[in-house]
Each structure stands twice: as C-alpha cells, then as structure tokens.
C-alpha cells in the first residue's frame, strides 16, 4: 500500500499476536514483486493504538482469525474493514505448499489494494467509502 499508494497513503503492518520476526516467505514475496523489504519488523497492533501513534484513516484486518477478535480502539476513529485471507503461516506441507500460500495471500492483498486505490475518494462520502472498503474485503 505504501509503495502503490504514495504519496496519498502510508501503510503500516501489525498483528494481534506478532510472531517476533517477519517470515522469510513474506519477505520473498515482496522481493519477487520488486517492493522494498528492508527494515521491516514484527509488531503488535497495540503499537498503533497508543497516544502519539500515527493517525490512521483506514484500518484493514486481514487474518481470518482477526475477524473474531476484539480490535483496539483506534485513535481518530478510522474506517475499518475486514479483508480476511487464509493465514499463510498456518500452512503445513512441503516448502512449495508454504511458498504457494504466501504467494496466494500476497496476490489477494495486492488485488484488494488495487481496488482500494482505484476508488474515487474525492467524489465519495464517508458512508460510500465504508461500503466500498467492506465490499472489497468480500471479493
């Protein structure tokens, strides 16, 4: 999102239960897509709910499990939507199976980000934007 959406959007990534390190498979997907993958770290979404955190306009949960969790109260009341994808870190099997799961997750997110970035934000009101980001998560 930060790369494709600049300068309008700056994206952050965090999770409800961070693993402590960014998975190498995730870093490889970024590399394959020619996206920056340096300096990334595993972090809790609580980091973005604290005073002094960057102001969020949109928050997208992506882990299928996150839809059932209680999310933090985000400062500034950003629009939220669930864009669930199967957790590639939960995949077992061969190295090819795991790599395929990460590739599939990347492709799903990339498609949704593209749809989001194509929204005519300036001509939509808040309710219409909320409806659109929710619809994108169902695709």
Predicted regions and their residues:
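Conserved active-site segments centered on acidic
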Residues: 1-50
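Structural signal for conserved beta-strand scaffold positions within catalytic alpha/beta enzyme cores
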Residues: 13, 61, 81-84
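Generic detector of well-ordered secondary structure
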Residues: 32, 62, 110-111
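Alpha-helix C-terminal capping/helix-to-coil transition sites in glycosyltransferase folds
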Residues: 54-55
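Short glycine-rich anion-binding loops that position phosphate/pyrophosphate groups of nucleotides
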Residues: 64-67
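Phosphate-binding/catalytic loops
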Residues: 70-139
């Amino acid at each position: 999102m930060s790369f494709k959406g600049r300068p309008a959007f700056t994206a952050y990534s965090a999770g409800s239960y961070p693993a402590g390190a960014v998975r190498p498979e995730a870093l490889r997907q970024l590399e394959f897509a020619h996206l920056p993958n340096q300096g990334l770290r595993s972090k809790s979404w609580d980091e973005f709910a604290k005073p002094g955190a960057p102001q969020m306009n949109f928050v997208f949960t992506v882990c299928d499990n996150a839809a059932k969790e209680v999310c933090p109260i985000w400062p500034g009341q950003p629009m939220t939507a669930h864009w669930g994808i199967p957790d590639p870190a939960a995949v077992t099997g061969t190295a090819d199976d795991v790599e395929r799961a990460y590739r599939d997750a990347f492709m799903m997110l990339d498609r949704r980000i593209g749809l989001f970035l194509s929204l005519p934000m300036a001509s939509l009101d808040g309710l219409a934007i909320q409806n659109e980001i929710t619809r994108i998560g169902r695709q």
